[in-house]
Structures are given as C-alpha cells and as structure tokens.
C-alpha cells in the first residue's frame, strides 16, 4: 500500500491512474469554487479512493495508512459500499471530509465543499460503522472465524454474527466479499 505523488498531487492508491486523471480534471474544473490555490491543494492534500478493489487493504491496515498521511488534509472519495467505513474513519481520525460518489450527486460541488473545509459532522447522513463492528470486520479480513472472534472479544458467537450482519447492512454487501 503506497501513495503516490504525481505532479505534486497526492493520491492513494498509487496504481490508480484513472482515479488520478479524473480527480485532476475535477479539481481543475472546480478551480473557481475553491478558495485554496492549486499549489496548496497539491502540497497539503491526500485524496483516497475508497473503492471495493482497495477496501481490503484499508480495512486491514487502517492504523498504518492513517499514520502515513498524518499532517496532510485527507479527503476520502467513497463509493456507495464504502460510505459507512468512510464515516467511521471520519469520526475516529483526522479526516478533512468525505465525498460521496452517488449517481444523483454533483461530485464537483461536494469536492469543493470538502476542500474548502466546510464538511462537518452534521453533513453525514449515512450510517457509520461502530467500533465493535469495525473490530469484527478487521478480524474477518484477517481470516478469523466467528468462534475465535467471540473468544477474543469476550462475547457470544451470536453477538459476533449480529454485529457482522449489522455491518453488512450498512456496507450494502457481505463482509467476506469486501475483504477478499
């Protein structure tokens, strides 16, 4: 997991050239809506693409990537299946904001809103993953079985399945599909 500096614009994941190209064009397109200079955005911001292909790495190693971007203004670009996780990281770390990529949303306005620092907790309309659900998601991503998770978390197997089911409802997908 590495992030990349392309023409001083930081993106994560480094291999996602389509994301970089699209994001670069979007930022140039909304230049008149942004209060900060292009140079400051390139220098101080990290844009993270939370898509289903990269979610496994972000879930398993969230403490690593969060410490790697310390001191930067982190903007999460969240697909529908990763909105609840993006909200969790927004609440539990130093994230500047979340841009929700939906079919009916104007991504340009949302991106400008976040870059300008106007994204607040009240802007989160979707569910967020709880701490217990996140622990269970992490352990599932590491390949642990519900019985082992229950023993570690000091709860019943039924409780593990309940938290897993609740997390899956918020993520619109089965956990094992996201962490493959």
From Swiss-Prot:
Lineage top rank: taxon: Bacteria
DNA-binding region in chain numbering: 146-165
InterPro entries according to UniProt: Sig_transdc_resp-reg_C-effctor, Tscrpt_reg_LuxR_C, WH-like_DNA-bd_sf
Domain HTH luxR-type: 122-180
Location(s), subcellular: Cytoplasm
A cellular component term, taken from the record's GO annotations: cytoplasm
Pfam families xrefs: GerE
Gene3D superfamilies on file: Winged helix-like DNA-binding domain superfamily/Winged helix DNA-binding domain
Keywords, in A-Z order: Activator, Cytoplasm, DNA-binding, Transcription, Transcription regulation
SMART domains linked to this entry: HTH_LUXR
Gene Ontology MF terms: DNA binding
One of the protein's GO biological processes: regulation of DNA-templated transcription
Task performed by this protein: Part of the ecpRABCDE operon, which encodes the E.coli common pilus (ECP). ECP plays a dual role in early-stage biofilm development and host cell recognition. Positively regulates the expression of the ecp operon.
Record family assignment: Belongs to the EcpR/MatA family.
Protein name per Swiss-Prot or TrEMBL: HTH-type transcriptional regulator EcpR
Organism, scientific name: Klebsiella pneumoniae (strain 342)
Upper taxonomic lineage: Bacteria, Pseudomonadati, Pseudomonadota, Gammaproteobacteria, Enterobacterales
């Amino acid at each position: 997991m590495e992030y990349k500096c392309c023409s001083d614009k930081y993106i994560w994941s480094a291999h996602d050239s389509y994301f970089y190209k699209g994001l670069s064009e979007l930022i140039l397109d909304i230049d008149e809506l942004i209060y900060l200079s292009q140079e400051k955005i390139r220098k101080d911001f990290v844009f993270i693409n939370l898509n289903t292909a990269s979610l496994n790495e972000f879930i398993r190693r969230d403490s690593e990537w969060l410490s790697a971007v310390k001191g930067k203004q982190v903007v999460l670009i969240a697909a529908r299946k990763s909105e609840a996780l993006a909200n969790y990281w927004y609440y539990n770390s130093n994230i500047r904001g979340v841009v929700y990529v939906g079919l009916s949303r104007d991504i340009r306005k949302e991106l400008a809103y976040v870059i300008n620092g106007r994204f607040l907790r009240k802007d989160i309309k979707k569910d967020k993953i709880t701490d217990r659900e996140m622990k269970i998601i992490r352990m599932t991503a590491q390949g642990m079985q519900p019985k082992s998770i229950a023993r570690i978390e000091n709860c019943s197997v039924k409780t593990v399945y309940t938290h897993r089911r609740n997390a899956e409802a918020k993520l619109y997908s089965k956990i094992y599909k996201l962490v493959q």
